[in-house]
């Protein structure tokens, strides 16, 4: 059975947990919340839990790596927009698929994302950039 690690139980993370379970994955949640404080819904959508600290990346990486040695997983997702760098670190160190730092830099800015999508002819809508409050 495939396993997925989701770092962060914010709105994206909760959605990823639900979808992953529906797709038949075993779900591992890594979050700062104490396990006993997880909601009933969160608990029903996970198979394993790792308590980490989002702002202490090396500490979190060590906890996740220790878990991975016992129970390997196939991929990692970020459960919030501020977590891709931690996901990238974990994925790189554990030799798992990842988006890469350049992709993270380009997709955490809506403006950069829109420009790239427009270049790739994936973005049909017009959007406007303002350079001052007067515009």
Stretches with model-predicted labels:
Residues 1-103, 134:
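ATP-binding N-terminal substructure of ATP-dependent carboxylate-amine bond-forming enzymes
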